[in-house]
Every structure is written in C-alpha cells, then in structure tokens.
C-alpha cells in the first residue's frame, strides 16, 4: 500500500518564487469560472495573478498555507489576522478538483485553527461563503462554524476557545 505524505507549507504573495508557483496552480484550478466565483466572488474570469494579489493580498496581516500531498500542492487557504480582536478571517479555500471530498479541506482548516490557537492565541474565526456553494457550507458547519448573517453571501463564525 502506497501511503501519501500530507504536509503544510506557508507561502507568501510577496515572494516571487511563491508567486510563480501559485500562479501556475491557481490558473489551472480557476480555468473553470464557476470555481473562481465560488472561491473569490469579487474576481472576474479569466484569472489573473496580478489582479488576485492587488485585490486580496496587499495587507501584511495575511498568511497563506498550501496543503501538499507528497510534493504536489493540492490545496490553498488564506487568513487575515486581526491581533487587536484576537480573530482571523479565512478566505480563498480551494482544493484541487481531483482531491475534493477526501477530507483535505477539513485538514487544511484544522491546520489553520491549530496554528491560531497554539502560536497566535487567537480565539475566533470568521469566513464568508457563497450561498450556492452547498459543499463548502456543509464543510464549515461540520467544523463547528455557525451562520451569523445571510445576505449576498453567508457569514459564518467559530469560537476557538
């Protein structure tokens, strides 16, 4: 039996090598406009890394992690930290289509939660989800997130205490 190694790496949208790799991966994942809309509703198709960075990654309080299976990146998540409120906002969670519904998104969110609890002493997570993205809503609810507001998008929160 071939056991695959799962690991997590922190990447930066200010590092040119990371940007090059992320551009290749995200361009592939976002070749479907529906996937881009579910992940980042404010971004227009086709995906452009420069627009992605300028709209979402100019704040220095953003941390991004990728999930690797063996040496292949199959997942991405970002969070914006608010140290004053001891909270973080999750965004841009995506798993490569071939690896969806296998628990990798759950592992990626749990990894981020543990980082926040252990190292940063944060106690609250929030996120927004597109209403039509039922699989994401089910994932977040299974992880203990609660719906706090429904408008154009669904706002969810989770206490980490």
Where are these regions (language model features)?
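Short, Lys/Arg-enriched, disordered terminal segments
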Residues: 1-9, 119, 159-161
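Acetyl-CoA-dependent GNAT
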Residues: 3-92, 96-98, 109-111, 115, ...
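Active-site beta-strand termini and strand-to-loop segments that position acidic
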Residues: 68-70, 158-161
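Conserved beta-strand-loop-alpha-helix junction that forms the acyl-donor binding cleft
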Residues: 100, 126-137, 153-160
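Conserved G/P- and acidic residue-centered "switch" motifs that form tight phosphate/ATP-binding loops
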Residues: 103
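Conserved active-site alpha-helix within GNAT-family acetyltransferase domains
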Residues: 106, 131-149
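Conserved GNAT acetyl-CoA-binding A-motif
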Residues: 117-128
């Amino acid at each position: 039996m071939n056991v695959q190694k799962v690991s997590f790496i922190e990447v930066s949208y200010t590092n040119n090598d990371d940007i090059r790799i992320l551009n290749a991966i995200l361009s592939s994942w976002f070749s479907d406009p529906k996937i881009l809309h579910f992940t980042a509703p404010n971004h227009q198709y086709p995906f452009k890394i420069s627009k992605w960075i300028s709209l979402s990654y100019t704040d220095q309080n953003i941390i991004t992690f990728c999930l690797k299976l063996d040496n292949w990146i199959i997942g991405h998540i970002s969070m914006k930290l608010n140290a004053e409120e001891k909270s973080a906002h999750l965004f841009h969670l995506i798993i490569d289509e071939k690896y969806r519904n296998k628990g990798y998104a759950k592992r990626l969110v749990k990894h981020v939660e543990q980082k926040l609890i252990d190292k940063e002493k944060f106690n609250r997570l929030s996120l927004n989800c597109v209403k039509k993205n039922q699989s994401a809503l089910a994932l977040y609810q299974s992880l203990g997130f609660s719906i706090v507001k429904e408008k154009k998008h669904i706002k969810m929160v989770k206490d980490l205490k």
